[in-house]
């Protein structure tokens, strides 16, 4: 998933940060690097009920 997809889903960088319990500068850093860290991707997948999916589904951990 791309940072833009995540931010578009939640509506803003601030809303994304709040939904994930992180600070907004962390979300801004994703835009600068062009990628969402894998551990956050899994958290986002869970937070969106799978509407956004982690890039490496084979590496998912069981819940």
Regions picked out by a protein language model, each given a short descriptive name:
Residues 1-15, 19, 49-59:
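A short, Lys/Arg-rich alpha-helix, primarily the initiator
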Residues 17, 28, 45:
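Alpha-helical and His/Cys-centered functional microenvironments
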Residues 22-35:
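Recognition helix of helix-turn-helix/homeodomain-like DNA-binding domains
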Residues 36-55:
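DNA major-groove recognition helix of helix-turn-helix/homeodomain DNA-binding modules
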Residues 61-63:
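Charged low-complexity stretches with an acidic bias
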């Amino acid at each position: 998933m791309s940072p833009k997809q995540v931010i578009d889903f939640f509506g803003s960088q601030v809303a994304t940060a709040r939904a994930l319990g992180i600070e907004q500068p962390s979300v801004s850093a994703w835009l600068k690097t062009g990628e969402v860290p894998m551990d956050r991707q899994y958290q986002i997948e869970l937070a969106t009920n799978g509407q956004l999916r982690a890039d490496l589904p084979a590496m998912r951990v069981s819940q």
